[in-house]
Amino acid sequence: MKMSIRTPPRLLELAGRSLLRDQALAMSTLEELPTELFPPLFMEAFSRRCCEALKLMVQAWPFRRLPLRPLIKMPCLEAFQAVLDGLDALLTQGVCPRRWKLQVLDLQDVCENFWMVWSEAMARGSFLNAKRNKTPVQDCPRMRGQQPLTVFVELWLKNRTLDEYLTYLLLWVKQRKDLLHLCCKKLKILGMPFRNIRSILKMVNLDCIQEVEVNCKWVLPILTQFTPYLGHMRNLQKLVLSHMDVSRYVSPEQKKEIVTQFTTQFLKLHCLQKLYMNSVSFLEGHLDQLLSCLKTSLKVLTITNCVLLESDLKHLSQCPSISQLKTLDLSGIRLTNYSLVPLQILLEKVAATLEYLDLDDCGIIDSQVNAILPALSRCFELNAFSFCGNPISMATLENLLSHTIILKNLCVEVYPAPRESYGADGTLCWNRFAQIRAELMNRVRDLRHPKRIFFCIDNCPDCGNRSFYDLEADQYCC
């Protein structure tokens, strides 16, 4: 009988599964098991909680990396513990089996195709392609040390206590800290008592951390407890701070001292490229302290929903670390009563690199717009511009469009419906809005065919939210 090309992998698969049914047989034959059988059999053993088989397969793992995170999304704490027990046996005895190549236990929550590639290879018999298609692994600089094993993990601290997997892992790591290296590249703090956060940060090599997000309504006294840890994150590339408030019990002198302690930590962050600050109240009148401590050229700067003084904007425009920005987001910063000359200077500085500009809800009025138009029209790399929530007239909007029309890379533009679209009570006049929109679109089409232009209206009669309308007057988002 002629066998199809699918027969060999199918036979291998059946033979491998038989090993899981006979634990003793698995113990004696793992050293000779074909490499291509390890991933599909490991998945099978994990889902079926074949703990003894898992321990043995980990000890004979023929790949450099074991990406476990996609598998522990299944409720299998027992299987997870078995994997760590298998590693434990190797770490403590110090003698590794002949086939063992494992250097990285990867628990990062990333898009992972390792298991998918090998499963498809099992079905198709294309094991050579599976080897070629393996995703490259980003190493940790500290992996060159003495520890034989590195554990990659992402920390999401969002509840009062950790989930059972992370709790078990951290306890396991703590007891074996001399035998392995725990590497955390992403730290997200969304809500947890700081005493718990502190105990976790003490276990992590802070100089491995590359991204930090803090979004849990801290007041300044709590921020002071986090500040010393931030200064040790010397490879930090991205920092997100959200909902930082000034306690009413903090005096102006104390506030200045705390802000100084915090901002001076930026002197140590020589890899920082992306800085996001949303609803950070202590920036008011103190932005210069932070900017003067930046030691790198930022690619992304977002300061949103904050209160800034006019002097803060002036310091921002003079900061040498913003001259290579690709993203600038100042949405939600009220600029109504300020001169926009600092913003003009800022746009002139970043004109050669800026790709995304968001000035939503800044309260910019007609008399202010002219100040930024010459600089805006020179941002030739700009591909997205949003200007919603600024109460401007039809004439000002036409003037704005005439300056952005020459930006050939501009793909997405979002503008407010002009004031003439609304009645005296602030409600939208649909017929008038449709007429204005048609006039504007005809003018734009005469000069340049836009890729995507949206007009924004506030307080949609249907949902009460902000709505967007495109060229064809179809509602895009409501």
Swiss-Prot record:
Similarity annotation: Belongs to the PRAME family.
Keyword terms, alphabetized: Leucine-rich repeat, Repeat
Keyword Repeat in record: yes
Signal peptide: none
Stretches forming LRR repeats: 17-40, 99-126, 181-205, 206-232, 233-268, 269-294, 295-326, 327-348, 351-378, 379-403
PANTHER family: PRAME FAMILY MEMBER 11-RELATED, SIMILAR TO PREFERENTIALLY EXPRESSED ANTIGEN IN MELANOMA-LIKE 3
Taxonomy of the source species: Eukaryota, Metazoa, Chordata, Craniata, Vertebrata
Gene3D superfamilies: Ribonuclease Inhibitor
Protein name: PRAME family member 27
Gene: PRAMEF27
Keyword Repeat: yes
Molecular function GO labels: ubiquitin-like ligase-substrate adaptor activity
